[in-house]
Amino acid sequence: MSEEEAQKMLYQLQMLETYVADMSQRESALVGVMKEAAAAVSAVKGIGEKGESEVLVPLGLGTFAKSKVSSGEKIVINIGAGAAVEKDKDAALSYLESRIKEIEIALRDTSAKRQEAAANLEHGKAHLDQMMGQHSHSTSGNV
């Protein structure tokens, strides 16, 4: 293996390492979103179970106000691009559960890509080690 080939392979392995790290970060972010979505579903299900529920409304910078929510109130859902819609409890739950399914698909896809890239990375490292080992044996025999 020439030095140029080794450099090229090393660069490709570094790119794969970066990609694996990016996929790991995306996985972590998606897991966080999944937890948040599950908490939202749980909270929406709990609204109105006992008539009127007391909740904390976030005002920003860690500041909250106590408020009461009754079972008949609409739920406001952010649908992206700064837009929000009001939905009844069942429609809100349906929307949240469909979003969870989308996130699960994205998580599986990201995980599969990370695993494939990690396997390619390990294979590439083993191949590079093997090539470097053969190179050192051939050069040490010429001394």
UniProtKB/Swiss-Prot annotation:
Secreted found in the keyword field: no
The entry's keywords: Chaperone, Cytoplasm
Superkingdom, natural source: Archaea
GO molecular function, one term: unfolded protein binding
CDD domains noted in UniProt: Prefoldin_alpha_GimC
Entries under InterPro entries matching the protein: PFD_alpha_archaea (IPR011599), Prefoldin (IPR009053), Prefoldin_subunit_alpha (IPR004127)
Compartment(s) where it occurs, according to its Swiss-Prot or TrEMBL record: Cytoplasm
GO cellular component: cytoplasm; prefoldin complex
Record-annotated membrane-spanning stretches: none
UniProt GO BP: protein folding
Record-annotated disulphide pairs: none
Sequence similarity: Belongs to the prefoldin alpha subunit family.
Quaternary structure (record): Heterohexamer of two alpha and four beta subunits.
Role this protein plays: Molecular chaperone capable of stabilizing a range of proteins. Seems to fulfill an ATP-independent, HSP70-like function in archaeal de novo protein folding.
Protein name (record): Prefoldin subunit alpha
